[in-house]
């Protein structure tokens, strides 16, 4: 009985596997066709950097302020918080008190970290 159930469940994934194989196959065929058919005539003008029709004045690599990285890391942290919070909120009715207090500890650690960043002035640009 268990073998038949497992076999039937795996059979339901067959259309997804076929679609995945077709998508990968079509992607590889299109990439190969473009590599074979494409006209290649590189010259210095084609491979040079394009900047609004003018030659590039300077190197494109510039220094960025560290605050950009700080804001991006904070965004990732709080984005992951939301990613953890949504499934927890959906299943909230079926959870025990341990799950509730675990999430409260998680949220309080993030709140304390955010308050620390705010207090240190890491989010101010002036």
Swiss-Prot record:
EC number(s) in its UniProt entry?
7.1.1.-
Q: How does it sit in the membrane?
A: Multi-pass membrane protein
Give this protein's Gene Ontology molecular function annotations. Answer: NADH dehydrogenase (ubiquinone) activity; NADH:ubiquinone reductase (non-electrogenic) activity; quinone binding
Q: Which UniProt keywords apply?
A: Cell inner membrane, Cell membrane, Membrane, NAD, Quinone, Translocase, Transmembrane, Transmembrane helix, Transport, Ubiquinone
Specify the enzyme's EC class, one word: translocase
The record's InterPro entries line, in alphabetical order, gives: NAD(P)H_OxRDtase_bac/plastid (IPR023043), NADH_UbQ/plastoQ_OxRdtase_su3 (IPR000440), NDAH_ubi_oxred_su3_sf (IPR038430)
Q: One Pfam annotation, family name? A: Oxidored_q4
Cellular component annotations (GO), alphabetically ordered:
NADH dehydrogenase complex; plasma membrane
Q: List the catalytic activities from the record.
A: a quinone + NADH + 5 H(+)(in) = a quinol + NAD(+) + 4 H(+)(out)
- Is-annotated flag, keyword Transmembrane? yes
Coiled-coil region list: none
Q: Where in the cell is it found?
A: Cell inner membrane
Mark the transmembrane ranges.
Answer: 16-36, 73-93, 95-115
Entry annotated with the keyword Signal: no
Known role: NDH-1 shuttles electrons from NADH, via FMN and iron-sulfur (Fe-S) centers, to quinones in the respiratory chain. The immediate electron acceptor for the enzyme in this species is believed to be ubiquinone. Couples the redox reaction to proton translocation (for every two electrons transferred, four hydrogen ions are translocated across the cytoplasmic membrane), and thus conserves the redox energy in a proton gradient.
Q: Which family does it belong to?
A: Belongs to the complex I subunit 3 family.
Summarize subunit and interaction data from the UniProt record for this chain: NDH-1 is composed of 14 different subunits. Subunits NuoA, H, J, K, L, M, N constitute the membrane sector of the complex.
Name of the featured protein: NADH-quinone oxidoreductase subunit A
Say which species the protein is native to: Rhodobacter capsulatus
């Amino acid at each position: 009985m268990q073998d038949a159930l497992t076999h039937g469940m795996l059979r339901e994934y067959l259309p997804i596997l076929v679609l995945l194989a077709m998508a990968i196959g079509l992607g590889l065929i299109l990439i190969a066709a473009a590599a074979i058919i494409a006209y290649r005539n590189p010259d210095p003008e084609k491979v040079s950097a394009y900047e609004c029709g003018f030659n590039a004045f300077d190197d494109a690599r510039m220094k960025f302020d560290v605050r950009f990285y700080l804001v991006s890391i904070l965004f990732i942290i709080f984005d992951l918080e939301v990613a953890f919070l949504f499934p927890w909120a959906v299943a909230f009715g079926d959870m025990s008190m341990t799950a509730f207090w675990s999430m409260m500890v998680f949220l309080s650690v993030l709140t304390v970290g955010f308050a620390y960043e705010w207090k240190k002035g890491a989010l101010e640009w002036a």
